[in-house]
Amino acid sequence: MNLLSFDHVLKNPQDYVSEIYTYGFQDVADGRHIFRNIQPRGYHDDFAKFVSKLFPDYKIELNFVRRSPLNQEEPNFIHSDEMMGDITCILYLNEMAPVEDGTTIYDEDKNPLFVIYSKFNRMIAFDSNVFHSRNIFENFGYEESARLIQVIFLKYKK
């Protein structure tokens, strides 16, 4: 398993988050699952540019922001993103989050290996076939204080 973590990813993260909130969020159906509070992003936003430079041998398959307020119903908890790509990148976008917020990484038997804590403007990247979950099952906050992350799935260029 490979895992990377970078702090201070975006040059102007407060402006970036403000811009996200100007566009709003939507629910996206994927088969029998509904992913709530999603904002699709393009291939050229600041996070996508950072990730593309960091991983030049990969292409962006999907780029979106997700807002997850307290008690929002989610389609999964412990899961892998194997069907989405080869590398999963998560950018934490809350200036103020509960100290326990972040991502837990699991082994193949879904036993916790380690916990990564969120920090505003921190990115983590890991192999998409790795089991992981948000640290706080029920999410947190409301409206602009709700959990806010950006996710990019990368696929190896063949």
Question: Where would I find each of the regions flagged by the language model?
Answer:
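Non-heme Fe(II)/2-oxoglutarate
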Residues: 1-76
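Catalytic core of non-heme Fe(II) oxygenases with the double-stranded beta-helix
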Residues: 70-158
